[in-house]
């Protein structure tokens, strides 16, 4: 299975678990508990990625990035954001990757 197929397949499974919960499913559990639980897991996994990177443990870092990616996908489904939405935004940003720092647009303050 190629890279996009793995990501698409996982995303489709997550969407399916939201629409048709399966008893005992961890993904279903996250959706049942709601946004606060999902956000808590995204935060936890983000911290674990940082720690694994700091500890220079490549195998652990890969695992933690996978965990974070999964939980980000759960968040995306919860907030009705599609993979295509992310791909379109990344495509827009890709055009600016080679820009020099002083040529970049300033980021609006939140």
From Swiss-Prot:
Primary location group: cytoplasm
Places the protein is found: Cytoplasm
Superkingdom, taxonomy of origin: Bacteria
Keywords assigned by UniProt, alphabetized: Amino-acid biosynthesis, ATP-binding, Cytoplasm, Histidine biosynthesis, Hydrolase, Nucleotide-binding
One annotated GO biological process: L-histidine biosynthetic process
Name this polypeptide is given: Phosphoribosyl-ATP pyrophosphatase
InterPro entries: HisE, PRib-ATP_PPHydrolase-like
E.C. no: 3.6.1.31
Pathway listed: Amino-acid biosynthesis; L-histidine biosynthesis; L-histidine from 5-phospho-alpha-D-ribose 1-diphosphate: step 2/9
HAMAP family membership: HisE
Transmembrane segments: none
Gene Ontology CC entries for this record: cytoplasm
Entry's Gene Ontology molecular function annotations: ATP binding; phosphoribosyl-ATP diphosphatase activity
Catalytic activity entry: 1-(5-phospho-beta-D-ribosyl)-ATP + H2O = 1-(5-phospho-beta-D-ribosyl)-5'-AMP + diphosphate + H(+)
Protein family according to the UniProt entry: Belongs to the PRA-PH family.
Source organism of this protein record: Clostridium botulinum (strain Hall / ATCC 3502 / NCTC 13319 / Type A)
């Amino acid at each position: 299975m190629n890279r996009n197929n793995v990501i698409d397949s996982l995303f489709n499974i997550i969407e399916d678990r939201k629409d048709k919960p399966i008893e005992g499913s961890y993904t279903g559990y996250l959706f049942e508990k709601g946004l606060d639980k999902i956000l808590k897991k995204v935060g936890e996994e983000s911290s674990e990625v940082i720690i694994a990177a700091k500890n220079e443990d490549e195998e652990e870092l890969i695992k933690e990035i996978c965990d974070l990616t999964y939980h980000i996908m759960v968040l995306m489904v919860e907030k009705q954001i599609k993979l295509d939405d992310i791909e379109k935004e990344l495509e827009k940003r890709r055009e600016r990757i080679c820009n020099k720092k002083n040529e970049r647009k300033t980021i609006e303050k939140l």
